[in-house]
Amino acid sequence: MRDPVFTGTAMAYHPFHAHRPTDFPMSAFLAAAQPSFFPALTLPPGALTKPIPDHTLAGAAEAGLHPALSHHHQAAHLRSLKSLEPEEEVEDDPKVTLEAKDLWDQFHKLGTEMVITKSGRRMFPPFKVRINGLDKKAKYILLMDIVAADDCRYKFHNSRWMVAGKADPEMPKRMYIHPDSPATGEQWMAKPVAFHKLKLTNNISDKHGFTILNSMHKYQPRFHIVRANDILKLPYSTFRTYVFPETDFIAVTAYQNDKITQLKIDNNPFAKGFRDTGNGRREKRKQLTLPSLRMYEDQCKVDRDGADSDASSSEPTTGRDAGHSPGPVSSPLRFNRGSRDDKTCTDSEHEMDHQNDRCGGSSSPAPEPSSPFRSRSEDWGREKPIAEKKDDYPDSRKTSDSIFSIRNLEKDKLESRSRKDTDSSKKDTENSGISGSKDSFSPLMVQTESPSHFGAGHLQSLALSGLHSQQFFNPLNTGQPLLFHPGQFAMAPGAFSAMGMGHLLASVSGAGGLENGSLSAQGTGSTPSPFPFHLSQHMLASQGIPMPTFGGLFPYPYTYMAAAAAAASALPASSSTASSLSRNPFLSSSTRPRLRFNPYQLPVSIPQSTNLLTTGLPSGLNPSSESSKCGSREASPVPDHKSGASQRNGSPKTTMKESINELQNIQRLVSGLESQRETSSPRDSPK
């Protein structure tokens, strides 16, 4: 029985193995067909043309494979003969026609190129054929392979392909079996058979079954029909091979002929993004975003130059806020901004400069400065996810002629905008008698509600005589110098020890969580005793001295945020439990001072200046301003506070001297800061 089987097998392989024995090695079938059935894919090309039981020449790796499969293959030989005998009586005459022949002809005239990549690239046009004349009941396996068209290597020179030399050694052959195989003739003839999932690669060690080709070589795809009901019978079945000359191509790693590139762009539905005019979403998005991109670039220019004209900030504002404008807006701006606001506003602080415009839209309901008012809970609820972001409120940009970085300016704007809206709503609902300037407000970095033990003089002296320079430390020129929040000086000794992620959350969530008493009130009864050490940390960070708070546990962005939030640990469990809140107008939950805690470390030496009382002090801190109401429910920035100076503890001059002495003690406590001591000595006479 072996002789007929051997003969039949040899005849089945005759068209493929006689003159080129490596055309269809067994490994090609196994790698392409079902590698899970055959873990060892290194069979020699003629291994299965010998009698199966003869394993004398088999290697050690194949020794375990052949005994296990020998009986299976012998049975397969017998089954193939028995199954083919009755089927031979049924005559079929398959007719194969190439789909998209006109397109193939266009490519063929120019010289078809197919890109090969290491990860595998599909062919375009895809190899697609229509079959007729199959036996409807019989099962067929359809395959495809790609063979070298000649023994030449090519190069593209002077707009045409020419022979550049002899071909490189051929890559291992691989058959691509159609994933629907085996299927009945009726199924194959029902629709065109597409091999669109076939991928070409130049990775010699490819493990995915892709067809491996050499770049700059010409190849010819071939289509095979095998009448068999099992893929395991492929090596012992007769192949019908069909070749379409117009499908030959040259494998390239990048397109050489621009005409081929354009032809592929024009006809490949997946290349719409490269077209100049297209109907795809990508093209529409590109067209619609052009005006928005121009506005964005203009706005970036405005931010960098620090322009303070209304015209420079009003027009881009409408573009940025159009995505959230209640009125009808042009579709390009709505399309560009609306879908990205929520995403970009959650990005990290490092992308603030580039995403200034997008984040602005998510927190401003209308492009006009007089935007609809929002309640405090809604405002601070919205501040939680973007506490470290910025807002681009146009009013706060009008006077941005500082040399602060854009990032500092934008972060200040966020708090300014939210507090201004809260201001306006409070004025309308609860305290209509209080009049404040809407347009001049000072930004606040972190809002805390710690009880303060300092009066107006303390706060004035804490303006740090040299820091009232509006060029360096007052980016918005609203008349307020660099100030510290009074709550940052009233921390209990255990405030730092309890500092963990809770204070990071507090710093991120703003003051909304603090009002609800979500943080522990560990510093309720605290005294100013820890003031020198704690203030030194905050003050040094603001003066540009790179001294990390909390011993450098967290990086730069966290130290100043958590420093202000740590002061919030001295806050009572609820904003109504501490009696000091009712006594001091600065400490009620609604009228707490909005003193800006400047986070950015600028290496700027503090100039010697003695003007502390008049220059740059906000009206709310000036002891001469008596036109205010105490205990007002106004939650506005410091310039809007009109708290009476008569109700503050102590006289301004005496408290100023005390705080100045404390400031000098702070300077002495810090080691290695001789330069700071020299600059702090003139502060003894701030009057």
Curated annotation (Swiss-Prot):
Q: Where is the composition biased (Polar residues)?
A: 431-451, 611-630, 644-654
Give the GO cellular component terms, alphabetically.
Answer: chromatin; nucleus
Q: Which residues bind DNA?
A: 103-276
A single GO BP annotation from the record? positive regulation of DNA-templated transcription
**Molecular-function GO term, any one:** DNA-binding transcription factor activity, RNA polymerase II-specific
> Where does the record place it?
Nucleus
Q: What Pfam families does the record point to? A: T-box, TBX2-3_RD, TBX2-3_TAD
Q: What happens when the gene is disrupted?
A: Loss of atrioventricular canal formation and cardiac looping.
Q: Where is the composition biased (Basic and acidic residues)?
A: 338-357, 375-400, 408-430, 675-687
Tissue-specificity statement: Expressed in the axial mesoderm, notably, in the notochordal precursor cells immediately before formation of the notochord and in the chordoneural hinge of the tail bud, after the notochord is formed. In addition, its expression is detected in the ventral forebrain, sensory neurons, fin buds and excretory system.
Coiled coil (residue ranges):
654-681
User: InterPro entries annotated for this entry?
Assistant: p53-like_TF_DNA-bd_sf, T-box_DNA-bd, T-box_sf, TBX2/3_TAD, TBX2_3_RD, TF_Brachyury, TF_T-box, TF_T-box_CS
Q: Which CDD domains does its entry note?
A: T-box_TBX2_3-like
Q: What segment(s) does the record annotate as region Disordered?
A: 303-452, 611-687
The protein's UniProt keywords, in alphabetical order, are:
Coiled coil, Developmental protein, DNA-binding, Nucleus, Transcription, Transcription regulation
Q: What is its main location?
A: nucleus
Listed transmembrane segments: none
What does the function comment of this entry state? Transcription factor which acts as a transcriptional repressor. May also function as a transcriptional activator. Binds to the palindromic T site 5'-TTCACACCTAGGTGTGAA-3' DNA sequence, or a half-site, which are present in the regulatory region of several genes. Involved in the transcriptional regulation of genes required for mesoderm differentiation. Plays a role in the specification of late notochordal precursor cells and formation of the differentiated notochord. Required for cardiac atrioventricular canal formation.
Subunit and interaction comment:
Binds DNA as a monomer.
Q: Which PANTHER family match?
A: T-BOX PROTEIN-RELATED (PTHR11267), T-BOX TRANSCRIPTION FACTOR TBX2 (PTHR11267:SF82)
Its name, as the record gives it, is T-box transcription factor TBX2b
Q: Which species is this UniProt entry from?
A: Danio rerio (Zebrafish)
Encoded by which gene?
A: tbx2b
